[in-house]
């Protein structure tokens, strides 16, 4: 059996990741840096403050708690503590483990409550009262869009957390916002051919969709992908965020003529809707002479743990998985496991990477002055952070990298081994014209606060 055990001597890991050597901490010293240009909260003392804005309550709280763990680990590594994590595997060698530009990294955090208004208020407070020079985090696209707009107004860079709506780097994109996570359009491109091969071209789909920006664009992307296969969309139904009982939404599916249910839900909402759909017996039914199937376009190991047996055989997509074998993934999984006793989620991974990418951009720019940091991020090619070669595209601030098609394992080894990576979709196959989703990045003008 595969397990994570924390001891005084570090992480003892049985299975595929055993025997990995810990990277040595870095203790390079750099002289003090004098800023000659000012933007909001450019640090003048010996520390620089990050603002971690994550959902610690609400339906996406499990993701938020893992994000905060990852951010705290990133701060340790940036400050030269611990084993260095992904710093040694990162293709850029600007970060030396001595803070950023000679300043020690400090942080403040806030609870977004999985609500856009609360996320915006929390971010504003961290900028205006706590002096945060960057805001990062979140697990809802509604939060991301709201905070990104605020940060554009304040002149503070926002490194998004887990946000999957096409709108984040589409119609609602901002010069001060950057997304590492993939999007709904990419999920549709990756997942469509796989479920087409698995379930055939003659299918009728029923969508239950979280009623906010992510759900809307996920539904749109999955409709496009499945209708391209020849599937018929029977009905699309919007559901409120954070409800516990989905019976009133699942019951009509039974008599709709649909033979596939597509759940455009995330976090606890996905856990509840999927488990209840299975309890209603949907997966045991034959409809139109076919076995009824359920598809969850976006899910994670954390959600799989919550869904339990219901996740078996379910197809979806993911941004990253801790069982990948590249050096960056191995290093991060080892560090996170040593610190917390569990493997990291995709939410933890994308947030850890975003913290490193911002810090690295400051080092490469030689300043915290926001317009120069933005320039350092735009068009940046990098590798070694768990997703293979990656581009931070300048036109929309979207990262392009390989994505994963995953499926719930029928016979998992343990509660950490619930997903099987079925296919890796190359970055070139999910790359699209930046103009298709509209939007305008806006100016990079510096602002003081």
What name fits each language-model region?
Residues 381-449:
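Solvent-exposed, acidic/polar segments of extracytosolic/periplasmic ligand-binding ectodomains
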Residues 2-4, 10-32:
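N-terminal export signals
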Residues 35-38, 62-69, 84-170, 180, ...:
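Beta-alpha junction/loop-to-helix N-cap segments that form part of ligand/metal-binding clefts
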Residues 47-64, 68, 205-208:
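Short beta-strand segments enriched in small/hydrophobic residues
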Residues 267-270, 322-381:
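Extracellular/periplasmic ligand-binding modules, especially the Venus flytrap/periplasmic-binding
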Residues 117, 129-237, 283-285, 290-315:
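Extracytoplasmic ligand/sensor domains, especially the bilobed periplasmic-binding protein
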Residues 63-91, 187-190, 213-229, 357:
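Short, solvent-exposed amphipathic alpha-helices that sit
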Residues 26-53:
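C-terminal segment of N-terminal export signals and the immediately downstream linker at the start
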